[in-house]
Regions:
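N-terminal auxiliary segments of SAM/dcSAM-dependent transferases
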Residues: 1-25
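Nucleic-acid modification enzymes, centered on SAM-dependent nucleic-acid methyltransferases
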Residues: 16-71, 99-228
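Conserved class I S-adenosyl-L-methionine
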Residues: 73-83
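Glycine-rich SAM-binding Motif I of class I
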Residues: 85-89
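Gly/Ala-rich phosphate-binding loop of Rossmann-like dinucleotide-binding domains
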Residues: 92
Length: 228
C-alpha cells in the first residue's frame, strides 16, 4: 500500500458546509475546485491512462476520501458505477480499500489497469518483446468488427491486428491487460472517427486517412526518457 505524504483532511471544510446548509435550510452550491486548492496535478498518476467520456473531476473524490468526517484509515470504498476508476485510484492513494463495478467492459478494463501497479522496467521489457515479435509477423487475422473498413484503412487494420495477436499471446494477465488497454488507445487515435464524437466520419477525411497511411505502428522506438 502507498500513502500520500501530508495529505490534507477536509473535515473542517465539510463541517463549514454542513453549517451553511443548516443556516440556509435548503440545498447549497459547492465548488470543489475552489475547496481543493493547490491541486495542480489533477491528472497525476494514472488518471489519464485512457480517455473516457464524462469523467468525474478528481477534486470530488479527493475531497470526500481524504476526509475524516466520512472515512478513516483502512475503511472500504465502494463505487458501484466506477466508470474509468477515478474514485478507485484516489481511494487507493489515500490508503483505503476500494471496490468497483461497471457494466461497460472497457470501463472495467481501464479501472483495473489504472489501479494495478506494474514496475516500469517490466513494462519496457514486455514492450520490447511485443514490438520485436510484431515485426516478424507478416499478417494476422483481423477481428470481426462491424463496418471495420469505415473505421480504419486497410493498413491500420493490418498493423493493429498484428499487435493484438501478439498481445493476446502474453501469459501474464496483468501485463496483457495493460497492453490491451494501450492498444485501445492507439486504435482510437488511428480510427477515422471524429475526435470529439463517438461516430464514424463517413465523409472521406483526407487528413485522417493520410495519418493512418503514413503512421507505422510497429516502428515505435523505445527510449530511456524518464516519464513522470
Amino acid at each position: 500500500e502507498r500513502k500520500h505524504i501530508n495529505v490534507p483532511d477536509f473535515r473542517d471544510e465539510t463541517e463549514a458546509l454542513v453549517e451553511r446548509y443548516k443556516a440556509k435550510g435548503t440545498h447549497i452550491s459547492v465548488n470543489f475546485r475552489s475547496i481543493v486548492k493547490n491541486f495542480s496535478h489533477v491528472d497525476r498518476y494514472t488518471h489519464s491512462i485512457h480517455p473516457y467520456p464524462a469523467k468525474l473531476i478528481t477534486h470530488i473524490p479527493y475531497f470526500f476520501i481524504n476526509n475524516s468526517y466520512f472515512l478513516k484509515d483502512g475503511d472500504v470504498v465502494l463505487d458501484p458505477f466506477c466508470g474509468s476508476g477515478t474514485v478507485l485510484l484516489e481511494s487507493i492513494l489515500a490508503n483505503k480499500r476500494a471496490y468497483g463495478a461497471d457494466a461497460n467492459p472497457l470501463a472495467r478494463l481501464i479501472s483495473e489497469v489504472k489501479t494495478e501497479y506494474i514496475d516500469p522496467v517490466i513494462i519496457r521489457k514486455n514492450l520490447k518483446k511485443i514490438l520485436e515479435k510484431s515485426r516478424k509477423v507478416d499478417n494476422a487475422k483481423i477481428p470481426e468488427i462491424r463496418n471495420s473498413t469505415l473505421w480504419y484503412t486497410k493498413k491500420a487494420l493490418a498493423e493493429l491486428s498484428i499487435l493484438k495477436s501478439v498481445i493476446d499471446g502474453l501469459t501474464d494477465d496483468t501485463i496483457r491487460k495493460f497492453f490491451m488497454l494501450n492498444l485501445s488507445n492507439i486504435s482510437r487515435k488511428l480510427s477515422l472517427a471524429e475526435n470529439h464524437f463517438n461516430v464514424c466520419h463517413f465523409v472521406v477525411n483526407d487528413r485522417k486517412i493520410l495519418l493512418q497511411e503514413s503512421y507505422n505502428i510497429l516502428s515505435i522506438k523505445i527510449t530511456n526518457k524518464k516519464q513522470c
